[in-house]
Amino acid sequence: MNHNDFFKLIAADGLRGAYLLQGEEEFVKASALKAAEKLIPEDFRAFNMSVLYEPDADALTEACETLPLFGDRRLVVCNGLASGLDYPRLADYIQKMPESSILLINIKGAADSKNSLVKRLRSEGRAVEFDELPLSDIIKWCMKTANKQGAVLDSDTARTFAGLVGTDMTAISNELQKLIDTVGPGGTITRDIISRCTVGSIEFQVFAMIDCFTAGKVRDGMRALHGLLEDRDAALGIASFLESRFKLMLEGRKLMDGGLSADCCRKA
């Protein structure tokens, strides 16, 4: 099941039983958890919602076995799975959970495919994949979010914005909110405002810096480099980015030494 199907299930009030939430897109995953939380009336969440962090099997089953109070259902959010859990036992338990309980197992990143509980949920179509969003979805999300807050953002400008910030939705959300706050209700987000207010991804900033040097704009290139190095997190990001590039160069060199042409190496 993809994240869109899961959101539709929430909107249709169709959540029943246990679900596994996994994948690299943590922002969308968190949004799904917030949407599911709204299934429980706010006044009764203290009674009918439990949030657990790497619980043992007894704590997890106890939370699921607790009957709802002043309502007809209970939401249990399990953040992470502790090592050493009796997974076969839990895999069997989710088959006989009370119908009043909804269990959401929230895994950061990818879940262990060898885990018997994960296998069971996948086999039953209860594993929700939160993969990196395609650019088209990011553009639509940006336009919709801006519109909800009274700002105007067209698709071409949204594409420029996404190209600058990258595909991490947490960064997208933070930077977009800055733009919305800058233009205010009824304002229009333009490329000029984006260029003045948005912090681009490390990859984008590095390539922009290199473009300055290759175009002979040494002063602009040095200014961009110093700007990056002044930010400790950016400096670490540059190191990580360059490391990944060097690894690709080394892999390409090995392939060429093995007899592959440069064109074949680019496609590999």
Task: Label each PLM-derived region with a short phrase.
Residues 1-268:
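Conserved beta/loop motifs at nucleotide-recognition and modification sites
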